[in-house]
Amino acid sequence: SGAMSFAKELENGSAQFYQKLSERFTKEKDLFLSFAKENGDYITQIERAYYGVISDAIEGCFAFNIDPEKYSFKTELSEKTALTDALKRALEIEEKMITFYSDAAEQSKSLMADVPRAFKMVAKKRTLRKEKLSSLLAVKA
């Protein structure tokens, strides 16, 4: 599905962003690396739920109506980007990802409950991640 490919694209972009942050801001390295790893876990979780019901979705002619522009984000940081600015960018990324997963959950309600539940779970986990980032930003600002 286009939505699944797009979810992978978003997760991979976000993972690369956190990987770069871990290399630049070594004091927070473990946190950023854990976020990058979690992104892969999220994809696995969603794929497992989605492909478990895909035959039902195809029979029902299900399709996501996802506008990639609405969820796109920038991952580039200049060499001079301060940690506080990097954290603000991370918060923007998380907000886009939460919106994507919430919208995907809403659109997939007609599928078996596993798919929207998986999308909602990732949105919830990303909300918790956003809270961690906000706390870190408050300390560093």
Model-predicted segments: where are they?
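Non-heme di-metal
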Residues: 1-141
